[in-house]
Amino acid sequence: MAADEPKNLSFVLEGIKKVKFEDRPVPVLKDAHDVLVNVRYTGICGSDVHYWDHGSIGPFVLTEPMVLGHESSGVVTEIGPAVKSLKVGDRVALEPGICCRRCEPCKSGKYNLCVDMVFAATPPYDGTLAKYYVLPEDFCYKLPSAMDLKDGALMEPLGVAVHITRQAEVKPGDTVVVFGAGPVGLLCCAASRAFGAIKIISVDIQPERLDFAKKYAATGVFLPEKASAVENAERLRSGHGLGRGADVVIDASGAEQSVHTGIYVARPGGTYVQGGMGRDEISFPIMAACTKELNMKGSFRYNSGDYKLALELVGSGRLSVKELVTKVVAFTDAEQAFEEVKAGKGIKTLIAGVDG
């Protein structure tokens, strides 16, 4: 490396829509179990765009410069002396949330609820849109030979979708309705199919997204009309032969109207899982939820076993993520890529690593 070449070029958010490329020190291993990863691909997530566009998400507020990105894959370039599961040169998917391992949620396996979570690109912690990133070996997952590094960058959103689908307890023979045909919603459709669902209906307000969903993993699609949630739910049930309703409803949109329609379209005794986040507070059809005695759950990120299952599904060929990647851009084009994702272009955009 020439003396004037950047050692750890990073894509840094300084304020709302104010970003820069900054050469930062190469991170050092802080623990004997740490590994240093040369990041090769990073997907742009809606949360990254929200921080860039608004400077905050709920209680997480940008107060100092932060490296963006958390959906990444890469190649191990250095390992700590206690690392046993990885070696230099291994291709890995990065799980970007490091838990404390000591609190009750961590010890119960629900480490996504860790009280001291350090999550990449969630203020104040830096993300993975840099040449190098350090994390513990057990949060790096070696990619099976059947998977490439682009697939690896999709393991983070797939982990989210796997967790949602496991929360919903989708089983063989189930009918599933998924609201939202963005990357996570589409992956919920794919995971539901892998888990044995026989009917999977994708719901979205963008026809082109529904066209993609039908080709990808959904058995049917539904475009809501400008009508009440009750009316759209009835159209959805009757139009797709759902009888009294779907066994499982997943909302991956966070839109209030989708939440309402989802509650109404679920069958009595069915399951409703909220995976999408929208406004902090919305109105809610509590009468319908109670009188149907719905099993209602929230879903947040991923926890024990979700990443491993995501890799197994893709590595074994039971689920494919390649179709979701609609564009790959150079690291130096990251800001333009954020603009395009905000405009709704494509399904999943990847930013190549600093080395290309």
UniProtKB/Swiss-Prot annotation:
<dbReference type="InterPro" id="IPR020843">
    <property type="entry name" value="PKS_ER"/>
</dbReference>
<dbReference type="InterPro" id="IPR045306">
    <property type="entry name" value="SDH-like"/>
</dbReference>
<dbReference type="GO" id="GO:0006062">
    <property type="term" value="P:sorbitol catabolic process"/>
</dbReference>
<protein>
    <recommendedName>
        <fullName>Probable D-xylulose reductase A</fullName>
        <ecNumber>1.1.1.9</ecNumber>
    </recommendedName>
</protein>
<dbReference type="InterPro" id="IPR013149">
    <property type="entry name" value="ADH-like_C"/>
</dbReference>
<feature type="binding site">
    <location>
        <position position="45"/>
    </location>
    <ligand>
        <name>Zn(2+)</name>
    </ligand>
</feature>
<dbReference type="GO" id="GO:0019569">
    <property type="term" value="P:L-arabinose catabolic process to xylulose 5-phosphate"/>
</dbReference>
<keyword id="KW-0859">Xylose metabolism</keyword>
<keyword id="KW-0560">Oxidoreductase</keyword>
<feature type="binding site">
    <location>
        <position position="71"/>
    </location>
    <ligand>
        <name>Zn(2+)</name>
    </ligand>
</feature>
<dbReference type="GO" id="GO:0003939">
    <property type="term" value="F:L-iditol 2-dehydrogenase (NAD+) activity"/>
</dbReference>
<comment type="similarity">
    <text>Belongs to the zinc-containing alcohol dehydrogenase family.</text>
</comment>
<dbReference type="Pfam" id="PF08240">
    <property type="entry name" value="ADH_N"/>
</dbReference>
<keyword id="KW-0862">Zinc</keyword>
<dbReference type="GO" id="GO:0042732">
    <property type="term" value="P:D-xylose metabolic process"/>
</dbReference>
<dbReference type="GO" id="GO:0008270">
    <property type="term" value="F:zinc ion binding"/>
</dbReference>
<dbReference type="InterPro" id="IPR013154">
    <property type="entry name" value="ADH-like_N"/>
</dbReference>
<keyword id="KW-0479">Metal-binding</keyword>
<keyword id="KW-0119">Carbohydrate metabolism</keyword>
<comment type="function">
    <text>Xylitol dehydrogenase which catalyzes the conversion of xylitol to D-xylulose. Xylose is a major component of hemicelluloses such as xylan. Most fungi utilize D-xylose via three enzymatic reactions, xylose reductase (XR), xylitol dehydrogenase (XDH), and xylulokinase, to form xylulose 5-phosphate, which enters pentose phosphate pathway.</text>
</comment>
<dbReference type="InterPro" id="IPR011032">
    <property type="entry name" value="GroES-like_sf"/>
</dbReference>
<dbReference type="InterPro" id="IPR036291">
    <property type="entry name" value="NAD(P)-bd_dom_sf"/>
</dbReference>
<dbReference type="InterPro" id="IPR002328">
    <property type="entry name" value="ADH_Zn_CS"/>
</dbReference>
<feature type="binding site">
    <location>
        <begin position="180"/>
        <end position="185"/>
    </location>
    <ligand>
        <name>NAD(+)</name>
    </ligand>
</feature>
<feature type="binding site">
    <location>
        <position position="70"/>
    </location>
    <ligand>
        <name>Zn(2+)</name>
    </ligand>
</feature>
<dbReference type="Pfam" id="PF00107">
    <property type="entry name" value="ADH_zinc_N"/>
</dbReference>
<dbReference type="GO" id="GO:0046526">
    <property type="term" value="F:D-xylulose reductase activity"/>
</dbReference>
<keyword id="KW-0520">NAD</keyword>
<comment type="pathway">
    <text>Carbohydrate degradation; L-arabinose degradation via L-arabinitol; D-xylulose 5-phosphate from L-arabinose (fungal route): step 4/5.</text>
</comment>
